[in-house]
């Protein structure tokens, strides 16, 4: 059996995956990376080894950590994985903040909307929200719309990240102007 992340060893929404692997009689398990979640963190691997299963850990670890980057960031840094997204002209400029300017093309809009569909929340600054009135939903891709968050003077980034962590939101995409992006 090949898995990108260590099988869980605790009861949560589902029974432990490690127990299922043991009961199914699997002889060998190849694990890409260890689960950083405190309730697992090596215990799943130990459960398998205690049952006599041959376990190899760290195969394609870098690639597996990339696949699980949102989950891993959540459990190692106690905040969501953050994606900074902006559109700029070929000569490196953002829009002028006076008129909403469409810089993105159809393909980049699709890519942006895919990122939105894969993210739990989306954040823009107050100025962007007021001037551009962005929809911040998913239209050019299939998937759920992320939670909309507007950064204002009354809210700090740390408070937003703490709330998202508490709610187990694993990813945040920031689509702000220059000052919002610089805040991260």
PLM feature spans:
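Zinc-dependent deaminase
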Residues: 11-184
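A short, small-residue-rich loop immediately preceding and capping a beta-strand
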Residues: 1-5
């Amino acid at each position: 059996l090949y898995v990108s992340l260590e099988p869980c060893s605790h009861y949560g929404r589902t029974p432990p995956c490690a127990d299922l692997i043991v009961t199914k009689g699997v002889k060998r398990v190849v694990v890409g990376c260890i689960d950083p979640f405190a309730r697992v963190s090596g215990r799943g691997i130990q459960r398998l080894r205690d049952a006599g299963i041959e376990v190899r850990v760290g195969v394609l670890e870098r690639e597996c950590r990339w696949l699980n980057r949102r989950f891993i960031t959540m459990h190692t840094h106690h905040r969501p994985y953050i994606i900074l997204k902006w559109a700029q002209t070929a000569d490196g400029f953002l829009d002028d903040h006076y008129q909403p300017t469409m810089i993105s093309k159809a393909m980049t809009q699709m890519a942006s909307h895919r990122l939105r569909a894969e993210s739990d929340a989306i954040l823009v600054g107050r100025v962007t929200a007021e001037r551009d009135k962005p929809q911040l939903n998913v239209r050019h891709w299939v998937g759920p719309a992320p939670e909309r968050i507007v950064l204002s003077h009354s809210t700090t980034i740390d408070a937003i990240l703490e709330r998202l962590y508490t709610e187990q939101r694993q990813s945040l995409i920031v689509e702000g102007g220059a000052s919002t992006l610089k805040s991260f």
